[in-house]
């Protein structure tokens, strides 16, 4: 097999580059791959632009090496290329929600065995305005932590960097809800909210059951809205999130849709996150699912 590695060298801890060398060496030595081309990113959008150049049949698969942001760029590039190139994932980021949801192996032996077996899973892709995503679009409380935490903090502290940044912002954001309107094919929801997530998988922000009914192959999004609440309601909500039963909380709205139009009815600016990246054009949002939009290499 012939493959292309698209690597974000700034992702992961200090020993991560040695891990990549081990994986590449094993793929060649065990004759799983007979050609491996390497592309290293230097700046934002490099991964997307390289993946966008792919042509059908040029490679048997492309490997996204980095965090959720790198994976997002590769997904955008592959979709835009229309090459239908399968994507394998080596996670080096801080949270790695999509890889967690699919239980993708991260050790050298497990990854190489997965490539050798080469089982493909066709999954849905999301589109928000003119960008594609694989896991989540979110806005509100804690949702912008991913792109505010510096690379140095993530490299040193790992997931703790997110928790510290989020804890500092939580009191301020809790008392500043914003009004949003959500319009789907069948319903309209308008309310004062703290956070919303349009999800493709169950795992968001390191929490494995944020959207307990979500599936990457059902052709719909799961939409989670956390409404304005009082202080007495927050502890039961947090406990519910940890147990995956928060959708029964009175301040939570949970529904599924193929498309959703989202309007910010507040005066203030609300940042939008898609797969850990900042969505520059912001509101209003038109989010739609692209059923069976991409192929992912998964373990048996």
Enumerate the predicted regions with their spans.
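Glycine-rich beta-strand-to-loop/alpha-helix junction loops that act as flexible
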Residues: 9, 65-67, 90-92
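ATP/nucleoside-binding phosphotransfer catalytic cores, i.e., glycine-rich phosphate-binding loops
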Residues: 17, 184, 190, 215, ...
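Short Gly/Thr/Asp-enriched flexible loops that form oxyanion-binding sites at enzyme active sites
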Residues: 69-82
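ATP/NTP phosphate-donor binding region
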Residues: 1-62
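Catalytic core of DAGKc-family lipid kinases
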Residues: 30, 41, 80-194
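Glycine-rich phosphate/pyrophosphate-binding beta-alpha loops
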Residues: 138, 142, 197-210, 278
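Gly/Ser/Thr-rich active-site loops/lids in small-molecule metabolic enzymes
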Residues: 151-161, 212-233
């Amino acid at each position: 097999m012939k493959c292309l590695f698209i690597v974000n060298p700034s992702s992961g801890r200090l020993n991560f580059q040695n891990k990549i060398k081990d994986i590449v060496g094993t793929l060649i030595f065990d004759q799983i791959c007979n050609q491996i081309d390497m592309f290293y990113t230097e700046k934002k959008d490099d991964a997307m632009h390289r993946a966008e150049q792919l042509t059908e049949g040029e490679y048997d698969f492309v490997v996204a090496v980095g965090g959720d942001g790198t994976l997002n760029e590769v997904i955008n590039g592959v979709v835009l290329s229309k090459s239908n190139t399968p994507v394998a994932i080596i996670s080096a980021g801080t949270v790695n929600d999509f890889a967690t949801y699919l239980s993708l192996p991260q050790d050298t032996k497990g990854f190489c065995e997965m490539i050798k077996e080469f089982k493909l899973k066709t999954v849905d892709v999301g589109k928000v305005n003119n960008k594609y995503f694989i896991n989540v679009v979110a806005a509100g409380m804690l949702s912008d932590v991913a792109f505010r935490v510096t690379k140095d903090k993530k490299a040193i502290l790992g997931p703790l960097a997110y928790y510290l940044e989020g804890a500092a912002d939580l009191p301020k954001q809790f008392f500043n809800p914003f009004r949003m309107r959500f319009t789907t094919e069948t319903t309209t929801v308008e309310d004062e909210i703290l956070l919303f997530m349009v999800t493709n998988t169950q795992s968001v922000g390191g929490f494995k059951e944020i959207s307990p009914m979500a599936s990457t192959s059902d052709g719909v999004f799961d939409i989670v809205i956390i409404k304005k609440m009082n202080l007495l309601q927050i502890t039961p909500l947090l406990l519910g999130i940890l147990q995956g039963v928060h959708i029964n909380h009175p301040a939570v709205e949970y529904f599924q849709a193929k498309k959703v139009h989202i309007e910010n009815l507040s005066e203030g600016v609300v940042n939008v996150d898609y797969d850990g990246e900042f969505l520059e054009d912001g509101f209003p949002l038109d989010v739609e699912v692209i059923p069976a939009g991409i192929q992912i290499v998964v373990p048996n």
